[in-house]
Amino acid sequence: MTAAGELRPVDGLALSPEHRAALRPGEAVTDEQGAVHRLPRFFFQVPSWQEAHALRVASHFALSELITVDSREERLLLRTFPHHVPCAILALARYLEDFRRAADAPVFVSANGGYRSPSHRINQGRVSLHSWGTAADIYRVGDTYLNDEKSIARYGEIAAALGADVRVRAYKEGDDHLQVDLGYLTVVPRECSES
């Protein structure tokens, strides 16, 4: 598996009960503003970590770069394969590739800074766009670490200029990354049915 076209989509509702409990496919959740959103229902199945490293989801990004998590991830999802990644991860990869081109430098996403499940303990019961696979925490661009207001603002302007569908979180005291997101985007693969 080396190209995004080789990813196998699966309906999250057809996964094991344990996986459904951790991923909560299609479940309605309420964000901090009171808006209701549905968690992703359709996922790409990733057979192994080696395949995640080999799979190019964009010219300069391997899938593994967008799904690296730490021990706060749900144990089942962290330690067993296959992994399941929301299909919208491909839209995020395409956006990050455009950002890399605009910044004219390699882009680095932090651990827990790409996709993480709704069960990840860093979420602390909150709704996180990371659970849709549509948010990225960028900690470095080229040789520049994004750990101060000036560097985050500089690359935030570049990120925001790429389109109205992108939201760039404003700098807050103590930030050590630039957060970008594409919203609550869900993808239904052509070969999948919502019925």
Per-segment meaning from a language model:
Residues M1-V46, S195:
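N-terminal secretory targeting signals
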Residues A4-L13, V127-S195:
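Catalytic cores and adjacent binding grooves of peptidoglycan-active enzymes
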Residues R56-L63, H83-V85, I89, S117, ...:
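General structural signal for secondary-structure boundaries
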Residues A91-Q124:
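Extended, low-complexity, intrinsically disordered C-terminal regulatory tails
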